[in-house]
Amino acid sequence: MDIVDMIVHVNETVPAERMNELEEVLRTDACVISACSSNPHLLMVTYNPACTTSGNLLNMVQAQGLHANLVGL
């Protein structure tokens, strides 16, 4: 299985509790292996590209009412 890491930059400053909620939202996707943050603006997501895309995962974050972009690695 291939895996891909991506970073999502959230424009808003998000409190730690809200970032934890975002991590949980991303983990609902069966293709997400892990989602974590150690910064109020950044989420690191590891996923299987065979069954989802970075765009789909970005849309999941944006659907939570946040302005977010992908950061290239």
Describe the function of each predicted region.
Residues 34-37, 65-73:
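Conserved short beta-strand edge segments in small beta-sheet-based binding/regulatory domains
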Residues 14, 22-38:
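Short acidic amphipathic segments
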Residues 41-46:
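A generic structural motif
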Residues 1-12:
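Short glycine-/aliphatic-rich beta-strand segments at the starts of folded cytosolic domains
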Residues 48-52:
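Helix N-cap motif at beta-to-alpha junctions
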Residues 20-26, 56-64:
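Short amphipathic alpha-helices in soluble, non-transmembrane regions
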